């Protein structure tokens, strides 16, 4: 596939709050498990095997652009990708997810953590980005990273958790060690993400998947300062910055305070409600991914409701409120993308009130 001459800037315009001829759309986890081509690859390769091979990884990344017509691609990688670079051994186990055999338990464990050198430690990430941007994509490529709290939760729990008790106990009982861990992870994230931008990523999304486990007061005490440092550094790169977390609607106002461009919402907080609470930056979201398993009439109606709310401002990007489920039909995503484009374009032209 050769890169087309016409570059689709719709996503970038919306991220900056500028006018575009239609509402841009992309989907979290659009590349991967819901696609037959990907499942066929997974019969032969593990996740890390795919992500370590730029040609394969680029293929998976660009599939949704070619098949669904989305307005942005997101790099196919795992949030755990950079952790081995600082001395954290990670294994992806089927049916479980990321597993860390030697969880963080002390200040000494944190002091042992090293620094990332992207060119040496994750060259395959940078090569994939360059391959996509220089040869294969006519839409912006979104790079990404996990956020400190979510990465720390895996490092302390040793894997996925339902309540994050060990993580929060560590945070409360060893604040100095916690602050050092946040600082080291922030250093890693800043260097890792800047390398993605230098390689050609046109926007960045920071995923804080599990930060909703914290109340607002604890977020402001233990997390918000380090997030401010991360976004302040990344803002110097002049690409749109997006923040997203699941079950964290109570933190949307705090995200809005950070030097970022786009506030990602899950399905629990309506766009109208978010804006009534003072969210004036671009909003991204927020169709409940479960709705994609419903009849098309339901999908269409719920999508209209979100578009009608979101399009009250030029700063709106249509997405799901979480990742695409494995059992969602690719045909549904293709149809949904076309509907968002057509409905929003007609609405912008005044055909819908």
UniProtKB/Swiss-Prot annotation:
The keyword Disulfide bond does not apply. It is found in: Cytoplasm. Its EC number is 4.1.1.37. The record marks 78 as: Transition state stabilizer. This is Uroporphyrinogen decarboxylase. GO terms for biological process: heme biosynthetic process; protoporphyrinogen IX biosynthetic process. It catalyses: uroporphyrinogen III + 4 H(+) = coproporphyrinogen III + 4 CO2. One of its GO terms (molecular function) is uroporphyrinogen decarboxylase activity. Keywords: Cytoplasm, Decarboxylase, Lyase, Porphyrin biosynthesis. Substrate binds at residues 29-33, 48, 78, 154, 209, 322. Pathway: Porphyrin-containing compound metabolism; protoporphyrin-IX biosynthesis; coproporphyrinogen-III from 5-aminolevulinate: step 4/4. Gene3D superfamilies: 3.20.20.210. SUPFAM superfamilies: UROD/MetE-like. One of its GO terms (cellular component) is cytosol. Homodimer. Belongs to the uroporphyrinogen decarboxylase family. It is an enzyme of class 4 (lyase). Catalyzes the decarboxylation of four acetate groups of uroporphyrinogen-III to yield coproporphyrinogen-III. Pfam families: URO-D (PF01208). It comes from the Bacteria. The keyword Ubl conjugation does not apply. PANTHER family: METHYLTETRAHYDROFOLATE:HOMOCYSTEINE METHYLTRANSFERASE RELATED, UROPORPHYRINOGEN DECARBOXYLASE. NCBIfam families: hemE.
């Amino acid at each position: 596939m050769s890169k087309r001459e016409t570059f689709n800037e719709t996503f970038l315009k919306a991220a900056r709050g500028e006018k575009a001829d239609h509402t841009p759309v992309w989907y979290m986890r659009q590349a991967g498990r819901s696609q037959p081509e990907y499942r066929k690859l997974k019969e032969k390769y593990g996740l890390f095997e795919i992500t370590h091979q730029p040609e394969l990884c680029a293929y998976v990344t660009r599939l949704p652009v070619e098949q669904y017509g989305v307005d942005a691609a997101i790099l196919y990688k795992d949030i755990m990708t950079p952790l081995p670079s600082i001395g954290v051994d990670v294994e992806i186990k089927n049916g479980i997810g990321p597993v860390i055999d030697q969880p963080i338990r002390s200040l000494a464990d944190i002091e042992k953590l090293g620094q990332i050198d992207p060119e040496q430690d994750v060259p395959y990430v940078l090569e994939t980005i360059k391959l996509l941007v220089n040869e294969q994509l006519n839409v912006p490529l979104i790079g990404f990273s996990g956020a400190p709290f979510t990465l720390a939760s895996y490092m302390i729990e040793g894997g996925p958790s339902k309540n994050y008790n060990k993580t929060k106990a560590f945070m409360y009982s060893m604040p100095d060690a916690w602050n050092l861990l946040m600082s080291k992870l922030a250093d890693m994230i800043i260097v890792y993400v800047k390398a993605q931008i230098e390689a050609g990523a046109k926007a960045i999304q920071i995923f804080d998947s599990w930060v909703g486990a914290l109340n607002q007061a604890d977020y402001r005490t233990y997390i918000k300062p380090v997030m401010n440092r991360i976004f302040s550094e990344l803002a110097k790169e002049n690409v749109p910055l997006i923040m997203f977390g699941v079950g964290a609607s109570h933190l949307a106002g705090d995200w809005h305070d950070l030097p970022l461009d786009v506030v990602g919402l899950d399905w629990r907080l309506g766009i109208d409600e978010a804006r009534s609470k003072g969210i004036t930056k671009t909003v991204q979201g927020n169709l409940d991914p479960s709705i994609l398993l419903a009849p098309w009439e339901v999908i269409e109606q719920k999508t209209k409701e979100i578009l009608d709310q979101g399009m009250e401002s030029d700063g709106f990007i249509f997405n799901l409120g979480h990742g695409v489920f494995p059992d969602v039909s690719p045909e549904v995503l293709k149809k949904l993308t076309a509907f968002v484009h057509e409905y929003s374009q007609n609405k912008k032209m005044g055909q819908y009130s």
